Amino acid sequence: MDAKMKVERAAAGAAIDGVLKYVNHGDDRTKALLNLTDFVQKFTGNMFAEKTFDNIRTMLQNPDNKWVQYVNRGLDELDPQVIKMTALNLGFQAAFVGTKQIRMNREKYNCNIPWTMLMDPTSACNLHCTGCWAAEYGHKLNLSYEKLSDIISQGKELGTYFYMFTGGEPLVRKKDILRLAEEHHDCEFHCFTNGTLIDEEFCEAVQKLGNISFSLSLEGFEEVNDGRRGEGIFDKVLAAMDLMKKHGLLFGTSICYTRANLETVTSDEFLDLLIEHGCRYSWYFHFMPVGMDAAPELMPTVEQRKYIYHRLREIRSDKSDKQIFVMDFQNDGEFVGGCIAGGRNYCHINAN
């Protein structure tokens, strides 16, 4: 990190500290958030339209706005170190510094450079879920710590500061993930996990670091979830959520929707359960008939795909009171300019 970037990062950190200082003071918190908005607008220049910041200011001054309440709940419940490091690494480092760096290097090298990189530290997993695409790779493959760290170092030189882990089950390698997050403290890390290996000691380490977030796999309520993932897994995932919530960690869910569970996992009752246990967001991925014991009959119908397209937009809108940010990996492609594969915005390195 060069001297100029260090100064800019320190300034961004001070602005975030200014918000956190007033976390427990209603009027002062709003003022601090407005000041942070002014700082971001000045700092980013013409990177975003002026109207974007005007809309944010209007929203922040409306305490009844659902997304203002969402932000305030996060400030109340998330650990200050988690808030600061997420804002610095995902906001300043990845979205601001990284985006500029990537655009410059795309022109320089005349090739795609991903904004985020997905890596499989291992193909090993402690579960045996029906229809798991990752099982296609086997269970004995691993990327060494040195290889993982080297990939991240190379990525940072190009402007990539956001790294996601899947598998297998990435937390089979949780000691290495903690080590990576400490070594590359200017990066944001995200784990797609089944949640069963999350314990108190791990949560304490993540809380101290602040730059790791999580998406826990859940397929619906207990009967449906455990029917695909194994007996007792539903309760273990909820227990992991409660533990992470206690430590103020940032997490949500990763949901594979099928013909059988689509209505359930988008229902008000299910969303209320997620919110109650501390989830801030939920990823939705439609079932694909690949992997272990693939079942084509579980593919969503055309009508169901239409339904979830509109249902998730309804949940995000002011018409819904659900304070959880939902995203559909396939159906929300319009917001990232279409397909992100081929290194355009995303690259996947498996454990092979």
Q: Would you name each region that the model predicts?
A:
Residues 114, 211, 344:
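Conserved catalytic motifs of the protein kinase core domain
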Residues 135-139, 221-223, 289-292:
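A short, flexible beta-alpha/helix-coil linker loop
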Residues 34-201:
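Conserved alpha-helical substructure of the radical SAM core
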Residues 104-105, 111, 152, 171, ...:
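Mixed-charge, polar/low-complexity N-terminal
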